[in-house]
Amino acid sequence: MSERKLFTSESVSEGHPDKIADQISDAILDAVLSQDPDAHVAAETAVYTGSVHVFGEISTTAYVDINRVVRDTIAEIGYTNTEYGFSAETVGVHPSLVEQSPDIAQGVNEALEVRGNADQDPLDLIGAGDQGLMFGFAVDETPELMPLPISLSHKLVRRLAELRKSGEIAYLRPDAKSQVTVEYDENDQPVRVDTVVISTQHDPDATNEEIHRDVIEKVIKAVIPAQYLDDKTKFFINPTGRFVIGGPQGDSGLTGRKIIVDTYGGYARHGGGAFSGKDATKVDRSASYAARYIAKNIVAAGLAKKAEVQLAYAIGVAQPVSVRIDTFGTGTVAESKLQEAVRQIFDLRPAGIIQMLDLKRPIYRQTAAYGHMGRTDIDLPWEKLDKVEALKAAVQ
């Protein structure tokens, strides 16, 4: 009998407390960048019943009405009813933002490579905003070159939000979670979905029977291709039996607590740094996007079926301290050759990444729910496949 393996990933909806926090942080970032593209922002958010606290560091010439940004974001998510215990118009908003530390700013604004050097490359000016390691990943399991479990998990909660906002399922409330277990064959190819878990907040008068029916017919079967579902696929819909109290009324939320949901669902490694609320000088964010961009173009070029890219930086230094590529035995060329090609084609200094991916724009709020990678519903620069031909040529 051939060996088969299971792998599970989860996602959460835009109404999950941690995702509310992420979206508020990124909405503030976008509001600042729309006025001051060179701003340095590190905005953190905490949410709980009736309250939002925004704190962190911002260096900018922009004026942003934090109170309004917070309330507008909460309303867009769908928390507009006081019965939810968290409502856009009644929530207390408590901002506490200060200027970025000058000790950090001096390394970001003038990288080690240019200090005392009159003949400087302008792209050497920006040093990494912190030390750290970042990963990017791609695999040929889906058209968007993402692992199937996280791809399906995101699509399930996004479908729930669509049905809620359109009014097609009127009893749905904003908070929800999904989890998908995929069975892989001996060649690491996905063959079927073994288990689907969906927990969705609902009005108190909704019955378990109608929730179960609607979620299976209008969500699961609408999202998961029929080829992956069979009579052995298990469905767990609101397995606690009731999910009326949710969102920040049921659980507090913080920016940066869903980093695995934001990336590859645990299928690839993660350096530990969160994304939301951070401008692109923070390599936690920008280098993770660059690493995904590299990995996706490698797989799209047919140079590997699976690729993981690690980048690492020292604070205040422009050039990465390391670049590593792992193709897990699926590569068509040596990994050392791929690394040389990547160094040649991709400028991995923070300023180079910002220029390459045009990251000074206010594009981040849209990434703060349903994943930063593999998005097919929005146009993100790190998802482009414009380096495929250059990579093919470089490894000849």
UniProtKB/Swiss-Prot annotation:
Keyword Cytoplasm: yes
Catalytic function, reaction form: L-methionine + ATP + H2O = S-adenosyl-L-methionine + phosphate + diphosphate
Main location: cytoplasm
CC cofactor note: Binds 2 divalent ions per subunit.
Species of the source: Streptococcus sanguinis (strain SK36)
Gene Ontology biological process: one-carbon metabolic process; S-adenosylmethionine biosynthetic process
Subunit structure, as described in the record: Homotetramer; dimer of dimers.
Residues annotated as binding ATP: H16, D175, A176, K177, R242, F243, D251, R257, K258, A274, K278
Protein keywords: ATP-binding, Cytoplasm, Magnesium, Metal-binding, Nucleotide-binding, One-carbon metabolism, Potassium, Transferase
Subcellular location: Cytoplasm
Positions that bind Mg(2+): D18
EC number: 2.5.1.6
Name under which the protein is recorded: S-adenosylmethionine synthase
Binding site for K(+): E44
Family assignment from sequence similarity: Belongs to the AdoMet synthase family.
Superkingdom per UniProt: Bacteria
Job of this protein: Catalyzes the formation of S-adenosylmethionine (AdoMet) from methionine and ATP. The overall synthetic reaction is composed of two sequential steps, AdoMet formation and the subsequent tripolyphosphate hydrolysis which occurs prior to release of AdoMet from the enzyme.
Binding locations of L-methionine: E57, Q100, D251, K282
Stored PROSITE patterns: ADOMET_SYNTHASE_1, ADOMET_SYNTHASE_2
Cofactor(s) required, per the database record: Mg(2+); K(+)
